[in-house]
Amino acid sequence: MDAIKKKMQAMKVDKDGALERALVCEQEARDANTRAEKAEEEARQLQKKIQTVENELDQTQEALTLVTGKLEEKNKALQNAESEVAALNRRIQLLEEDLERSEERLGSATAKLSEASQAADESERARKILENRALADEERMDALENQLKEARFLAEEADKKYDEVARKLAMVEADLERAEERAEQGENKIVELEEELRVVGNNLKSLEVSEEKANQREEEYKNQIKTLNTRLKEAEARAEFAERSVQKLQKEVDRLEDDLIVEKERYCMIGDSLDEAFVDLIKGLEPFWNPRNPKPPTPKLPTPTPEELAAMEEARAAAEAAAAAEAEAAEAAAAAGEAGPDGAPAAPGEEKAPAKEPTPPKEPTPPPPPPPPFEYSIDLPPEGAEVPYVKNYEPPPPGSEPEPVPAAEGEAAPAAEGAAPPAEGAAPPAEGAVPPADGAAPPAEGAAPAAEGAAPPADGAAPPAEAAAAPADAAAPAAEAAPAEAPAAEATAAEAPPAEAAPAEAAPAAAEGEAPPA
């Protein structure tokens, strides 16, 4: 009922506010009308001035346009005010409908209240009926007492009659005996009546005791109701306090959970920084890849075109021709070495030291991609961990050792592994022979390394000319499509001993043939 009254009061307040706003809007509309009338009067005055003053025609026209614009604005404002008034009227109607609904609810609530009062009246009537029954029982007890008195009086009268009859029938023994028997029967009846009277008295006493007990129970029940009401109020107060404490604890738990998430994120960032520090401090340690810092994908080499394949075949044929020419030169040098001790020494400059194969350049490591988004299930350490999680060092797999650093300029590169030794009887290099690959340029630092699965260069392949510098950009190994042809090149090149330098023109051709496809 209080909520309904509050709602009705709030609705009345809204209604009064709406009516006040409607009155304010009407007053604004009236003000706008008065202003419009004033503007019309000003326009008339301006027209008179225009007629009288022709020189100020332009100024008055501009003022007229301004006044007409203001008039239109006022008309628009008036229309808006009318629309607002209509909206407020609709709102008032809705509020009246809500008021009617609330009145209906109030009527239903009053009906329920009347039903409850009727039920209370019925219970009160039942209590009065029980009291009336108790009074009727008391009246019955009084009537029984009166009947008992009458029975005693009748018994006394019977005794008197018995005495009279005994005196009259004293002479007749049979009558006397009968009278005695009757007297005995009367005495028995008197005893029975006395016993009944005692039973009735006991019942009356028990009823009085039960009535007293009932009164005591009623008082006890009232006291229990009062105590239960007080306990109920205390329990409600405790429940409200418990709800408030639970809300406070829930807020504290939410705050602690947020702090825990922030600390876990900071812990993961510290772990990543520690991993990066370990990678920077320990040389040869592979970086720690994780979902935040994934491993970059291996770049794929493009598939060579038919034109590039044809160029590679031509370069391979030119390399084989150069190897055959070097083999012939080696045979000629061997023959000249055999003839040298007999009195025909080899001319200086005929033989040269075998050129050493240049090392392939390294491929630059691409920069790592940006880390992925943070994931608690992956990035956080296992539960119960007391120390930071650091990945143990794993040695690199066999075959992935770093390549040796190429020799500096002016120094000879080490001989290729598996290179064919000089033929027996070959003359040592002459004193005036040019050192091998003195002017050869070292491989560029940014050159790409050999692709996975690509065939390595032939161990015994013929070196390029001593005077020709190997181009750094074309010094990459062959593509992935040439693994089948590598054994044949190794077999042919292993048979050829080191010989004199091939013509300078063969070196660029061989280098172009070994270059990977663009």
From Swiss-Prot:
GO terms for molecular function: actin binding; actin filament binding; kinesin binding. One of its GO terms (cellular component) is P granule. Residues 293-305, 357-374, 394-405 have a biased composition (Pro residues). It holds the Pfam family Tropomyosin. Both isoforms are only expressed in indirect flight muscles. Residues 318-348, 406-518 have a biased composition (Low complexity). SUPFAM superfamilies: Tropomyosin. It comes from the Eukaryota. Residues 101-125, 288-518 are annotated as: Disordered. GO terms for biological process: actin filament organization; dendrite morphogenesis; muscle contraction; oogenesis; pole plasm assembly; pole plasm oskar mRNA localization; regulation of lamellipodium assembly; response to hyperoxia. It is found in: Cytoplasm, Cytoskeleton. Signal peptide: none annotated. Its main location: cytoplasm. Residues 14-267 form a coiled coil. The keyword Cytoplasm applies. Keywords: Actin-binding, Coiled coil, Cytoplasm, Cytoskeleton, Muscle protein. PANTHER family: TROPOMYOSIN (PTHR19269). Tropomyosin, in association with the troponin complex, plays a central role in the calcium dependent regulation of muscle contraction. Homodimer. Belongs to the tropomyosin family. The molecule is in a coiled coil structure that is formed by 2 polypeptide chains. The sequence exhibits a prominent seven-residues periodicity. This is Tropomyosin-1, isoforms 33/34.
